[in-house]
Each structure stands twice: as structure tokens, then as C-alpha cells.
């Protein structure tokens, strides 16, 4: 075997092993994977029935904050799971996102209402402040902070 061929046979596996360990030791950087804990922003919006105002000061303790809409097909798929969580004692706050109030109420009457409280965010301002990119999205909130 020629000298060059012997060197290549040695260099290629060593290089591949080195590359493997370099890639293994680097941090994976995926878009959206940089999660940060942040406080629920200040807001004052009406409930879905339009009878009361809800602010961030009304939301206490631990809960799931679920962004949903009646026009959202994926929300319909997720909805039975939320109902199971609610039936098992998990507190869920709904954030109705860019939705017509009457459509949202009809949707809940048809498919069940798993929410302890529903915020009507018709313009999407609170959702925007939370960094929502679409529905559904669900946040775990612990003492006023999204974790």
C-alpha cells in the first residue's frame, strides 16, 4: 500500500471521530428553543361573555394559559385533551384569540368548556405581548410567570 493511501486510511477515520465529538459537544440551536421565564404582561381585557374586565392581577397561582379560537382547526383537535386536564383538576385559563365573541361562545357550547376563566383578546394585543405566533399555544404559568 502506498504511503499516501496509508495516511488517508488513518486520517479519514480520525477526522470523522473528531467531527463527531465536536458536533456532540456543541449546543443545539433551534429556532424558538431559547425559552425564557417572563412575567405575564399588564393587561385589562373583557371576559368572553363581555360582562367583566380581567387583568393580570386577577390571575393567581399555577395554571395553563391556552390560546385558542373557534376558527382554529388544530384547537379543535387539542380541545378534548384540555377537557381531560380540566376534569382532572388542572386550572386552565383560555385566551380567545382574534375571534368573534358569538362564534367562540357557540364553539364552547358545542365542544365543552374546559376553561376556569376566558379572556377575550379580539385584537390580539395580549397574545402579541406574550409572543404568540398562532393558535393554539399553551403556556405554563407559575405565580404570574410564564415558565
Stretches with model-predicted labels:
Residues 76-112, 122-128:
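Structural microenvironment flanking redox-active thiols in thiol-disulfide oxidoreductases
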Residues 53-76:
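Short active-site neighborhood of thiol/selenol oxidoreductases, capturing the structured segment around
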Residues 45-51, 122-124:
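Conserved SAM/SAH-binding loop
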Residues 6, 110-114, 121-147:
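Thiol/disulfide oxidoreductase modules built on the thioredoxin-like
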Residues 1-44:
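N-terminal targeting signals for export/organelle localization
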Residues 64-65, 92, 138:
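Hydrophobic beta-strand anchors of alpha/beta hydrolase catalytic cores
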Amino acid at each position: 500500500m502506498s504511503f499516501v493511501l496509508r495516511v488517508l486510511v488513518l486520517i479519514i477515520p480520525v477526522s470523522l471521530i473528531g467531527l463527531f465529538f465536536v458536533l456532540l459537544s456543541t449546543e443545539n440551536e433551534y429556532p424558538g428553543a431559547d425559552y425564557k421565564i417572563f412575567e405575564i404582561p399588564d393587561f385589562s381585557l373583557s371576559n368572553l361573555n363581555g360582562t367583566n374586565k380581567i387583568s393580570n392581577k386577577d390571575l393567581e397561582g399555577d395554571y395553563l394559559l391556552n390560546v385558542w379560537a373557534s376558527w382554529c382547526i388544530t384547537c379543535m383537535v387539542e380541545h378534548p385533551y384540555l377537557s381531560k386536564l380540566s376534569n382532572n383538576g388542572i386550572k386552565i385559563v383560555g385566551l380567545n384569540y382574534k375571534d368573534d365573541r358569538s362564534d367562540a361562545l357557540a364553539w364552547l357550547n358545542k365542544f365543552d368548556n374546559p376553561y376556569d376563566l376566558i379572556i377575550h383578546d379580539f385584537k390580539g394585543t395580549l397574545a402579541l405581548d406574550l409572543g404568540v405566533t398562532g393558535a393554539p399555544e399553551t403556556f405554563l404559568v407559575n405565580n404570574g410567570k410564564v415558565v
